[in-house]
Amino acid sequence: MGHRKLASPRRGSAGLRPRKRSSELLPTPRTWPQINSQNPKLLGFVGYKVGMTHVFMIDDWPNSPTNGKEIYMPVTVLEVPPIIPLALRAYAIDGKGEPNVITEYWSSSSLQFLDITRRIHSISSFLKDDESKKKFDERFNTKLDLIKSNLDRIVYFRLLVSTQPRKIPSLGKKAPDLVEIQIGGGEKKSQLDYALNILGKEITIRDVFKEGQLIDVVGVTKGKGFAGVIKRYSVVELPRWHKHRKGSRKIGTRGPSLGTPSYTPQPGQLGFHRRTEYNKRIIKIGDEPKEINPAGGFVRYGIVRNTYVLLEGSILGSKKRPIFLREPVRPSYVFENPPKITYVNLLSQQG
């Protein structure tokens, strides 16, 4: 009976299963960090991927062999217009021992952002006149009283925020993306006051992050469609000789006759997976698009017109895709100052 004479590690990571399409284009993080801050703040932000370029900067890693020298650094550009908090959601432990929403509070100031009706159609009924807005406030004031009376039960607050894609003509869409962002730092009372104060107001990325710090990136990877085991799991192709009449770009066997084990590589969906990348450094936050726009604009995107962010290295996702930026859950290093950039490539990317 034939058998393998050489050993090799199994192909494919079990930590990335199931390899299926993401259920949402802008996923909410499943984990949030605990920050040491007396003042409450949002723990995340949303941006749109533009493309990549490169810069030259002074290396400021303490133990790096090139510390203090000029180095080449590829960077990813994200366009980050302000976000708008729409509603406050309070989470408490339910009967099953899991955190769950006990209620949510909406303010009439949130209704000034009219594009929200493209996502939540029922809100349009409260935009008819002042009397409708008054009834809207009366309806949710009782829920605000419920939050204040159960402040000791609440484990954390989250804000339902909306992006403003209308400010980015390159996206070609008006419907905003909605996502929950948790509030961290301070006491529960100060977090509640902070949330009520910023409802309906624009929040910029400088209110959440600063230059030079590390962040986590959560998003959906590029979709590749249906792929075979060679590309999907990096399985070694079988040798091509005259007795291999059943193909080479496949596995030798799927297992015993009783069934196929779950860990056996098989063809299927590749890409469009929800993934998280840790500790991406913010190289720069800029308000002048001309400092980053190359000649002719970014290929398959166009021209940056709002506040932008430069992230060290590459990140997941295709161009124009929403990307969630989160405070790092396990930062590898804390930088005190942003790096010094000496050159930004603005040459045309169109060849």
UniProtKB/Swiss-Prot annotation:
Gene3D superfamilies per record: 3.30.1430.10, Ribosomal protein L3, domain 3, Translation factors
Organism: Saccharolobus solfataricus (strain ATCC 35092 / DSM 1617 / JCM 11322 / P2) (Sulfolobus solfataricus)
MF terms in GO: RNA binding; rRNA binding; structural constituent of ribosome
Function: One of the primary rRNA binding proteins, it binds directly near the 3'-end of the 23S rRNA, where it nucleates assembly of the 50S subunit.
Subunit and partners: Part of the 50S ribosomal subunit. Forms a cluster with proteins L14 and L24e.
Name of the featured protein: Large ribosomal subunit protein uL3
Gene Ontology biological-process annotations: translation
Keyword tRNA processing (UniProt): no
GO-annotated cellular components: cytosolic large ribosomal subunit
Keyword rRNA-binding: yes
Region (Disordered): 1-31, 246-271
Similarity section: Belongs to the universal ribosomal protein uL3 family.
One protein family per Pfam: Ribosomal_L3
InterPro entries xrefs: L3_arc_euk, Ribosomal_L3_dom_3_arc_sf, Ribosomal_uL3, Ribosomal_uL3_arc, Ribosomal_uL3_CS, Transl_B-barrel_sf
Alphabetical keyword list: Ribonucleoprotein, Ribosomal protein, RNA-binding, rRNA-binding
PROSITE patterns in the cross-refs: RIBOSOMAL_L3
